[in-house]
Every structure is written in structure tokens, then in C-alpha cells.
Amino acid sequence: MYAIIETGGKQYRVREGDTLYVEKLPAGAGETVEADRVLAVIKDGEVMIGTPSVENAKVFLKVERHGRGKKIIVYKYKPKKNYRRKKGHRQPFSRVTVEKIEA
């Protein structure tokens, strides 16, 4: 059985026991959060597709840790004008494990 969930504006295909990196969740490490926006559930060949989400379907995610991704460098300049700006960014993320899928 697997499900397609939406969190942080992105969609993920998950099974029980999967570990994935999602946009940072407002929960502490070790806490369990509920992904109630389940778009589809596939169970024993039976497909349940929601409009927009499947009713009474829940996916429980355990937050393992929070972190920040690799640094990306944004560099912009204007030619011949001595205008240069260098800026770095590290996107925060949460590493979660799928504990249980209810459908």
C-alpha cells in the first residue's frame, strides 16, 4: 500500500517505513505529525483518488530531525557599473519517516 501526499507545496509518493526530506515542518524532533492532505491511496490494487483529497485518509509522519540543505550562491551583477551582489541561501528541511497510512 502506498499513498500520495502533499506537504510544503510538493507531492510525495510514500510507503510505510519510507524516509524522506520535506520542507520544514512546525514540529519538534521526535514528534509525530499528521499529513491530512492525502491525494491518493493505492491499496491491494484498489485506487482511491481524492477530489482534492481522500476523505478519512491520514498519513502519520515522525519527524526525525531538522536541518538545512547545501548552500547555493546567488550572484548578480550589472556590467560596466561596478554593481556586484553575492548572497548565499540554505533551505531548511525536516527529515521524516512514514509511520502509518490509514485509509
Curated annotation (Swiss-Prot):
PROSITE patterns hit by this protein: RIBOSOMAL_L21 (PS01169)
PANTHER family: 50S RIBOSOMAL PROTEIN L21, LARGE RIBOSOMAL SUBUNIT PROTEIN BL21M
UniProt xrefs under SUPFAM superfamilies: L21p-like
Role, per record: This protein binds to 23S rRNA in the presence of protein L20.
Pfam families with a match to the protein in the record: Ribosomal_L21p (PF00829)
Family: Belongs to the bacterial ribosomal protein bL21 family.
Keyword Membrane tagged: no
UniProt GO molecular function: rRNA binding; structural constituent of ribosome
Stretches for region Disordered: 83-103
Listed GO CC annotations: cytoplasm; ribonucleoprotein complex; ribosome
Organism this protein belongs to: Pelotomaculum thermopropionicum (strain DSM 13744 / JCM 10971 / SI)
Keywords: Ribonucleoprotein, Ribosomal protein, RNA-binding, rRNA-binding
Assembly notes: Part of the 50S ribosomal subunit. Contacts protein L20.
Protein name as annotated: Large ribosomal subunit protein bL21
RNA-binding found in the keyword field: yes
